[in-house]
Amino acid sequence: MKRTPVLAASLLALLAATAPAQAGENPYGQGLDHCAATGTGALACHFDLAPGTYDVTVTLGGDTAGATGISGETRRALLAETPTAAGERIRRSFTVDVRDPEGEPTGPAGTPGLDLLLDGSAPRVDSLRVTPAPHATRLFLIGDSTVCDQPGDPYTGWGQRLPVHLKRGVAVANHADSGESTVTYLANPALFDTVEAAIRPGDPVLIQLAHNDKQTDAATYRAHLTTLVERVRARGGAPVLVTPVVRRWFNADGTLDNGVALLVNGLGVDHPAEIRALAASLGTPLIDLTALTKARVEELGPEASKALYLTTEKRDNTHTSVRGATEYAALVAAELKAQGLLPERALR
């Protein structure tokens, strides 16, 4: 999207009015002709690109101190807010997955191409470059609404916040979809069939499905997870089973030791226990996110843990806030590193 002269003039006027900079300074630098000011101090950029993986290299900084973060597509966090001192320049790179639809697989198509938002408390961008990265590794995510790229604030899936932990060369391909179970994820061609066709040898595939398997019996649940694992392996991918994030449902003693919190369904199927046992029997890596999130919620207690979920905003103790998704994504990233599921050089 090349700026018209009128838009360029408006952009320069807005920058001069909003930036705490010396006279004549453009805090966004030069060469950003795919970008326009939003009116809130941020910079929105659009690139007409086909679906695929792309490297983004950005030089942050300016004549005055700044702090810049980058998000993109459907509210994906791509680069954590990064401070720069006056006169400092910092180069950062990451890889982004561009797909259609851009968010949830069964959701709205969104905008074709790549959209980036350069914001933060004081955005300072000197240059921006986007180049094809056809050989990048994709880290696929299979899951439900607790994982997906949620389109509307304040709902946020942990998969939406995971990209900030990855360096250039690995892109999160979040194919999680709200409301899906092991049954529906396999049945809908827009879901697993699409993921399966895109997997290349060595691509990690994280699988977290449980919240919506409310009436799935144990044998069927195990069979569906086994099918997912085996079909990923058949493509040369590296499946990783992930136990579900807990619900914020406290006992009187301040623990989460109950079926609602720990995802035991109406048939008495203990999903986390089934996943742990299956991972052991199949020799599949396991990220025990149930145990990790349980420990975090219990550590915070009944009151402080509300901030991790949408308890206050929506009376929702299942779906995470931006803060909760951010913390849970960090737990997943730490496990990817600790278990060697991604090379250490790929993680920030």
Model-derived features with residue positions:
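Secretory targeting and sorting signals
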Residues: 1-23
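Compositionally biased, intrinsically disordered or flexible polar/acidic segments
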Residues: 20, 24-152
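Solvent-exposed loop/turn segments at secondary-structure junctions
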Residues: 62-64, 145-149, 177-183, 211-216, ...
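Structural recognition of the beta-strand scaffold that forms the well-ordered cores
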Residues: 138-143, 147-148, 171-176, 203-209, ...
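Oxyanion-hole/transition-state-stabilizing segment in secreted/luminal serine hydrolases
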Residues: 187-223, 246-249
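Catalytic His-Asp segment of secreted/periplasmic serine-dependent ester chemistry enzymes
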Residues: 188, 249-348
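Alpha-helical scaffolding segments of alpha/beta enzyme cores, especially the outer helices
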Residues: 194, 223, 227-230, 234, ...
